[in-house]
């Protein structure tokens, strides 16, 4: 198994737990994060090594990434696993999967890259690399079927894990927060994302605080290194801020509004039925390249799935403290708009809640049996 960054680690843990239910003696090893390790996966390398994004950052880390991929490829070719599972991290995994598939190892890829949003030409590379694609959004299934790639729609594991009714009161009690308005700030799990978004979000929080004196802020840090950078970003700011060690789901359950860096966390916020502002910043060169290849007007998963701007997006030069603060204040001041959005997000949640564990186990079972 190979997973990249925090979201892949979480999905990888759910994936392996699903497989173990009917195969308690099953073992797995590869590139894994702490949640996968807790689920029983042996980490040959930590998944944080793959947590880089954007053309500029990838180029900076390219020698190490290529070295790790060469080493892990040799390891799997030598050990000959019954099945290989790549979880997200497509640019890393597809080359590895292609080598293993050529050697006769079945390759399962969990979570399709967003070929429907940009770089659709990747479908040909996927065809060479992947024995079976497991997709988490219903519209993705037809894309792979039309391309002649075996595919199963399994639903999204997070939709199964997150309750249909957000436990707001319990989360606030656990975190020691009061009854006043709470705004969650989620700058991203990668350190580069924290560097680009933490100060931006905190400055926006200062402006919100100036208009709403009783508001409090909660910010989950994905790692100790992220927590240290957040502390530096918050220096000199007088904010009622609670920084958490992880616990992003509790932060989202507790909040009234969230400011979220684009990524899986936007889907999590939607599953918790929370109004949000989606933001993202990347280096200017990366932004120019991505805009040229983009197929959709949205970047956030809630908007992509709704095919509409149901929540605001503030990207690149539009991502300013003024804009984020105005969006947060607009959500806080409009209960009817918040209630209407919750109805939209409830329907989305029910669509994605498919019992992913059972579907994953059923899709991969033939490959495990054939390799016995």
Curated annotation (Swiss-Prot):
One GO BP: lipid A biosynthetic process
Regions annotated as coiled coil: none
KW DNA-binding (keyword) present: no
Leading EC class: transferase
Gene Ontology annotations for the cellular component aspect, listed alphabetically: membrane
InterPro entries linked to this entry: Glyco_trans_19
Pfam families xref list: LpxB
Catalytic activity: a lipid X + a UDP-2-N,3-O-bis[(3R)-3-hydroxyacyl]-alpha-D-glucosamine = a lipid A disaccharide + UDP + H(+)
Keywords, alphabetical: Glycosyltransferase, Lipid A biosynthesis, Lipid biosynthesis, Lipid metabolism, Transferase
Pathway(s): Bacterial outer membrane biogenesis; LPS lipid A biosynthesis
Molecular-function GO terms, alphabetical: lipid-A-disaccharide synthase activity; phospholipid binding
EC numbers: 2.4.1.182
Role description: Condensation of UDP-2,3-diacylglucosamine and 2,3-diacylglucosamine-1-phosphate to form lipid A disaccharide, a precursor of lipid A, a phosphorylated glycolipid that anchors the lipopolysaccharide to the outer membrane of the cell.
Family: Belongs to the LpxB family.
Protein name, as recorded: Lipid-A-disaccharide synthase
Organism: Thiobacillus denitrificans (strain ATCC 25259 / T1)
């Amino acid at each position: 198994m190979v997973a990249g960054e925090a979201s892949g680690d979480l999905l990888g843990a759910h994936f392996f737990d699903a497989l173990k239910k009917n195969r308690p003696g099953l073992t797995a090893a590869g590139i894994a994060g702490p949640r996968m390790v807790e689920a029983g996966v042996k980490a040959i390398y930590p998944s944080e090594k793959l947590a880089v994004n954007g053309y500029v950052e990838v180029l900076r880390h390219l020698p190490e990434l290529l070295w790790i991929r060469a080493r892990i490829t040799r390891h799997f070719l030598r050990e000959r696993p019954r099945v290989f599972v790549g979880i997200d991290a497509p640019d890393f995994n597809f080359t590895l999967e292609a080598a293993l598939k050529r050697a006769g190892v079945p390759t399962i890829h969990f979570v399709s890259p967003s070929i429907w949003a940009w770089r659709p030409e990747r479908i040909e590379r996927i065809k060479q690399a992947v024995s079976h694609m497991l997709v988490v959004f219903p519209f993705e299934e037809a894309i792979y079927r039309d391309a002649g790639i075996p595919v199963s729609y399994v639903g999204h594991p997070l939709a199964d894990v997150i309750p249909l009714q957000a436990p707001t009161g319990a989360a606030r009690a656990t975190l020691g927060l009061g009854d006043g308005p709470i705004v969650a700030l989620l700058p991203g799990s990668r350190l580069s994302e924290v560097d680009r978004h933490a100060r931006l979000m905190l400055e926006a929080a200062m402006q919100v605080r100036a208009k709403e004196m009783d508001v409090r802020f909660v910010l989950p840090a994905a790692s100790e290194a992220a927590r240290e950078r957040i502390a530096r970003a918050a220096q000199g700011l007088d904010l009622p801020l609670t920084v958490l060690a992880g616990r992003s789901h509790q932060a989202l359950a507790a909040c009234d509004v969230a400011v979220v860096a684009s990524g899986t966390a936007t889907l999590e916020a939607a599953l918790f039925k929370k109004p949000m502002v989606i933001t993202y910043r990347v280096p200017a060169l990366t932004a120019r390249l991505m805009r040229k290849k983009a197929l959709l007007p949205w970047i956030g998963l809630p908007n992509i799935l709704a095919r509409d701007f149901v929540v605001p997006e503030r990207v690149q030069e539009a991502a300013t403290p003024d804009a984020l603060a105005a969006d947060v204040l607009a959500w806080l001041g409009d209960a009817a708009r918040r209630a209407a959005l919750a109805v939209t997000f409830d329907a989305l949640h029910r669509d994605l809640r498919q019992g992913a564990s059972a579907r994953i186990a059923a899709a991969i079972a033939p490959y495990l049996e054939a390799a016995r």
